[in-house]
Amino acid sequence: MASEFKKKLFWRAVVAEFLAMILFIFISIGSALGFHYPIKSNQTTGAVQDNVKVSLAFGLSIATLAQSVGHISGAHLNPAVTLGLLLSCQISILRAIMYIIAQCVGAIVATVILSGITSSLPDNSLGLNALAPGVNSGQGLGIEIIGTLQLVLCVLATTDRRRRRDLGDSGPLAIGFSVALGHLLAIDYTGCGINPARSFGSSVITHNFQDHWIFWVGPFIGAALAVLIYDFILAPRSSDLTDRVKVWTSGQVEEYDLDADDINSRVEMKPK
């Protein structure tokens, strides 16, 4: 673990997660807040939000950023995805911790920027996730679990090294579609979290943590279930416990060169 900590590529990856998260939150949440602005001078604010447009903004931004920084950090951009890859023994514990910190800080920074740009909006929630009227905490939790499960399942399948020849370069696009699909499912029920860092940034800046636990517990349960389903039922991995522990402590041996800053030894969100 200490060996990975000393490498420049490790810190480049952490910075990549931080910067990409800022862009992701700014683009995606900004697209949702934009519906409150009038397009013409005779229109009033408070237009009906177009769920399809917002879902596509979230999905396409993930697909674009996965292509942009996937070769540097893997472009997780989501603590639930990071947890899933950790439980799947594809990244080290240290990398997972630093990624989640970078993602959360990046989300906060992006939300602060959005807060300044959209300060004239009345009742600006900054994309705060909340349960819709009539949706209880159990139902909201279930929606978040299912939405995240399908996302992490897609990530595990598209980043499976055994499938690289089959997938080509379509991995980021598939993951982007999965994010959009999750929003089409969940946006009317919970505002669609499926990303604890995205939910955390809005809650911190608005000082509103009502039902916030749902947007951490749900995605983490969904991620764990996705790993259980993919790694132990659909596509079992042959690596033994010793190899898995080595990954947790030292990183993915096949993907990371821990003894030299080899520019080619990176894990990618897209197949190589």
From Swiss-Prot:
Glycans are attached at residue 42. Belongs to the MIP/aquaporin (TC 1.A.8) family. Residues 71-84, 190-202 dip into the membrane without crossing it. A motif (NPA 2) lies at residues 195-197. Detected in fetal kidney (at protein level). Detected in fetal kidney. The modification Phosphotyrosine is found at residue 256. It comes from Ovis aries (Sheep). It is found in: Cell membrane. Keywords: Cell membrane, Glycoprotein, Membrane, Phosphoprotein, Repeat, Transmembrane, Transmembrane helix, Transport. GO terms for molecular function: ammonium channel activity; carbon dioxide transmembrane transporter activity; glycerol transmembrane transporter activity; intracellularly cGMP-activated cation channel activity; nitric oxide transmembrane transporter activity; potassium channel activity; transmembrane transporter activity; water channel activity. This is Aquaporin-1. Forms a water channel that facilitates the transport of water across cell membranes, playing a crucial role in water homeostasis in various tissues. Could also be permeable to small solutes including hydrogen peroxide, glycerol and gases such as amonnia (NH3), nitric oxide (NO) and carbon dioxide (CO2). Recruited to the ankyrin-1 complex, a multiprotein complex of the erythrocyte membrane, it could be part of a CO2 metabolon, linking facilitated diffusion of CO2 across the membrane, anion exchange of Cl(-)/HCO3(-) and interconversion of dissolved CO2 and carbonic acid in the cytosol. The modification Phosphoserine is found at residues 250, 265.
